[in-house]
């Protein structure tokens, strides 16, 4: 019997695999089961595999199913092991840690404030210690940096320009940590919120730890004195005595703070105390409009540990604003607070990590500046573009000459930036044009610009890693307003064209579709198109037209004048500079390439539906 079985099972009785080179791509439980049955049939030894319910058939089912599951996990694991194919936040977070990329967590709202001192405050140099906060209508805004100012007289005095920024949220003192003395010792703050790609209901209403709001102090076991430690992009850039740490948002959504090993960054000794402070944001509920904080006074943050830290860190000559005289300082926020910005997603990390790796912790090229600002100031800046001094003169200033200005530097927006940020030698200037993330267009009509505090915030961070020869000049873009408009031959275009121009949507009378639905869809298409516009973008009227023509039932588009019997096919717009609407204005139905310093928006877009006419053909 054994001899017969051995003869029948001889390898020569089995066929070749005869699989195509891409057969692996179609393998699943069913194909594997069929392949096993086919090969058993070809061997001629077994027959029960052809009968469902037989023991061998059941065994084949188990093998095929196990193979199917294992293949699924193999494919998933293979995909998640590479940077370009990873889809899970935990995996891509780990992958980019190999190139020292640090994903950004959720960022809280920022408010720019002005500061005034009442007559009761005596003339002197004062410091409002960091973590002091104001509260209005149960909403808190705290400072993560010291605010210093000088009171020069006994009258009511505005003591600080609008260049102070507060972070929305409440200051928190994390439990004291005692160091163990290990090299590269790591302290973790467990975030109660999950990693960014995990879905929660009402995520916008859940408080969170605000990234970039951390302050760390260390008390030496040897001296018993508290000292502030600063964040660094990499400990490997630090000396053995550098009081620096690395911060990282890990794959679980928790913040890690890594200290040195005695060679790269100062090493914590056993018994050293580490105290971490941060801001817990109220999320979107804490975003306030302009003047909401008017009249609020600072409340000095105080705990036994923090009071001792202030005594150790600051010299005896420092005059602090204390709880006894905080009422003599009042603030106001002249502009809206910035929006809350979500943490970097998997797609954001995949886009930003290669760019930040190429920076190598320095700002030299145009791409370096644009990548750095876009990643680190996305709660302040919606769009950014960088021009060299040659480009500034040959493009930006030339634009003002082209619209009739004989002295472009006398333009108020140009002048204020030149005075505040430029130096007498301009050949090394780097001009950063930025569009604010919050309230980009006021009332859908008036262009908005970064305020002085936001520009200074951007400038401070860029100066830390910029090329030593560069002088950074934050600059204001040129805005281009768009609306429906068409002019007849030899007619001088004017802004008023928008008031008697209609967008005519022609729909098939045989298609059952509501006119209101068509108008709403067209409005949505326009809004999406202009929301995606950045500095230097193409305003693609052709794409907008095609998207409208793809609406079911729509068979044609025209732009029509209502004061004269005249219309043109597709979409025609009147385009103008709101600050020079008589000097820079034209009508076009072509796509428009904006210059790198120009930003386009649709003027009063919420009223567009009133200018849409639906006709049946």
Please provide the spans of the model-predicted regions.
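Extended Gly/Ser/Thr-rich low-complexity repeat segments
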Residues: 127-134, 266-282, 446-452
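Extended low-complexity, serine/threonine- and proline-enriched intrinsically disordered segments
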Residues: 132-134, 207-238
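Extended assembly-interface regions of large multimeric machines
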Residues: 1-210, 217
């Amino acid at each position: 019997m054994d001899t017969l079985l051995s003869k029948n099972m001889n390898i020569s009785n089995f066929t070749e695999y005869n699989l195509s080179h891409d057969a692996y791509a179609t393998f699943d439980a069913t194909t594997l089961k069929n392949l096993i049955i086919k090969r058993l049939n070809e061997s001629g030894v077994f027959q029960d595999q052809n009968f469902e319910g037989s023991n061998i058939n059941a065994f084949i089912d188990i093998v095929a199913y196990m193979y199917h599951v294992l293949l699924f996990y193999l494919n998933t694991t293979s995909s998640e092991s590479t940077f370009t194919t990873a889809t899970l936040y935990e995996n891509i977070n780990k992958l980019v840690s190999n190139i020292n990329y640090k994903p950004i967590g959720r960022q809280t709202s920022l408010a720019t404030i002005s500061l005034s001192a009442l007559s009761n405050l005596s003339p002197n140099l004062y410091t409002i210690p960091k973590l002091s906060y104001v509260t209005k209508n149960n909403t808190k805004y705290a400072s993560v940096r010291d605010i210093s100012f000088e009171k020069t007289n006994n009258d009511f005095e505005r003591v600080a320009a609008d260049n102070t920024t507060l972070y929305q949220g409440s200051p928190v003192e994390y439990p004291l940590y005692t160091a163990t003395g290990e090299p590269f010792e790591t302290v973790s703050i467990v975030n109660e919120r999950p990693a960014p790609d995990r879905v929660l209901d009402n995520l916008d209403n859940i408080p969170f730890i605000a990234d970039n709001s951390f302050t760390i102090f260390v008390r030496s076991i040897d001296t018993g004195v508290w000292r502030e430690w600063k964040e660094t992009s990499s400990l490997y850039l630090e000396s053995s005595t550098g009081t620096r740490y690395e911060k990282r948002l890990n794959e679980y959504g928790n913040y890690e703070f890594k200290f040195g090993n005695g060679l790269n960054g100062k090493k914590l000794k056993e018994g050293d105390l580490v105290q971490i402070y941060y801001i817990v944001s109220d999320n979107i509920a804490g975003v306030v409009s302009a003047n909401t904080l008017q009249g609020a006074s600072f409340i000095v943050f105080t705990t036994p540990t923090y009071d001792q830290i202030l005594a150790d860190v600051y010299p005896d000559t420092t005059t602090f604003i204390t709880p006894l005289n905080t009422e003599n300082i009042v603030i106001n926020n002249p502009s809206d607070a910035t929006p809350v910005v979500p943490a970097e997603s998997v797609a954001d990390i995949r886009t930003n990590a290669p760019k930040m790796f190429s920076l190598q912790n320095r700002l030299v090229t145009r791409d370096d500046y644009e990548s750095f600002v876009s990643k680190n100031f996305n709660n302040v800046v919606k769009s950014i573009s960088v021009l060299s001094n040659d480009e500034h003169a040959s493009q930006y200033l030339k634009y003002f000459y082209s619209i009739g200005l004989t002295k472009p530097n006398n333009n108020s927006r140009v002048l204020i930036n030149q005075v505040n940020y430029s130096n007498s030698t301009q050949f090394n200037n780097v001009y950063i044009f930025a569009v604010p993330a919050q309230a980009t267009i006021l009332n859908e009509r008036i262009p908005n610009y970064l305020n002085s505090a936001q520009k200074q915030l951007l400038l401070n961070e860029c100066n830390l890693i910029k090329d030593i020869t560069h002088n950074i000049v934050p600059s204001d873009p040129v805005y281009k307003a768009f609306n429906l408009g068409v002019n007849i031959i030899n007619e001088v275009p004017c802004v008023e064209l928008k008031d008697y121009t209609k967008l005519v949507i022609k729909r098939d009378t045989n298609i059952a579709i509501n006119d209101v639905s068509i108008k709403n869809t067209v409005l949505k298409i326009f809004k999406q198109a202009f929301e995606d516009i950045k500095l230097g973008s193409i305003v693609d009227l052709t794409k907008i037209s095609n998207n409208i023509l793809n609406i079911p039932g729509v068979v044609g588009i025209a732009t029509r004048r209502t004061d004269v019997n005249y219309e043109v096919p597709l979409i025609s717009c009147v385009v103008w500079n709101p600050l020079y609407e008589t000097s820079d204005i034209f009508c076009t139905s072509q796509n428009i390439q904006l210059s790198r310093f120009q930003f386009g928006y649709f003027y009063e877009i919420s009223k567009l539906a009133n200018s849409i006419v639906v006709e049946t053909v």
